[in-house]
Swiss-Prot record:
Belongs to the CSM3 family. Residues 15-24 have a biased composition (Acidic residues). One of its GO terms (molecular function) is DNA binding. Interacts with TIMELESS, which impairs TIMELESS self-association. Residues 1-68, 186-205, 217-238 are annotated as: Disordered. Keywords: Cell cycle, Cell division, Cytoplasm, DNA damage, Mitosis, Nucleus. It holds the Pfam family Swi3. One of its GO terms (biological process) is replication fork processing. InterPro entries: Csm3, TIPIN/Csm3/Swi3. Plays an important role in the control of DNA replication and the maintenance of replication fork stability. Important for cell survival after DNA damage or replication stress. May be required for the replication checkpoint induced by hydroxyurea or ultraviolet light. Residues 74-150 are annotated as: Interaction with TIMELESS. This is TIMELESS-interacting protein. One of its GO terms (cellular component) is chromatin.
Amino acid sequence: MAMIDPLENNLFDLPDYENTEDETFPPLPPPTSPGRGDAEWAQANGDPDGNQQSETKDSSSAARKAVKRSIPKLDANRLVSERGLPALRHMFDNVKFKGKGHEAEDLKTLLRHMEHWAHRLFPKLQFDDFIDRVESLGNKKEVQTCLKRIRLDLPILHEDFTANEGGGGESNGLDMATEEVHSFSGNVGELDSLPGTTLTEEQQQRIKRNRQLALERRQAKMQCNSQSQHDELSPSYPEEELNIPVARDLTGALEDTQVTATNVAVTETEDRERELQCASEKQ
């Protein structure tokens, strides 16, 4: 095998650094010079794009200083929001449970709807963690107030207030019958007492009609209350027990009459004996 001569084919030829001229570079500005990064200084030194690096640095620093988005949290305000506890009031309106003998299926249906509600309210938590978090939030004042309003069927959201304004008169008509009667009578008295105020026939008829409706509602309510009280008393107190006081009163009256008659007869007998005794003494 032939050896290769390293001097052949100029394998180890080195460049002639002694006779090679160095590249010319623009001088660097001093560290404290105000011209560093200046566009005029860059153009004067043959670097028209010298300010691009500074612009990119400024943009990157501005991007780093951007305000971070707040991470949503499962707190009391979110729990009492529209998708929170108020949504549970109407969640099971269209759900039909199978009843006795199908308790396991009904429980699965209940849990499935509750998991759906929890996912819509706060998707980042698993259902078990969500339950623990809600349990810890149960002592908050906002949550307690929301639960009380739900139990008392009071309006919570804006839609509840608008719904009550639209249909509150019909639903609570019987409960407000007495107040309506007093309010109508008071309004009529005030209108009559005000000087210079005249009511048209239509207004008077409307007032009379409203008063009549209020009176009818009040009578219906009183009749329902009396009927319910009678129904409650009748099974617990049979008719025989209810008639016992009357029978006792009649018996007592008869006994008093008999005692009075006996006393009168005794008195008359004593008077006759005294008269006979006086007559015998005179003779």
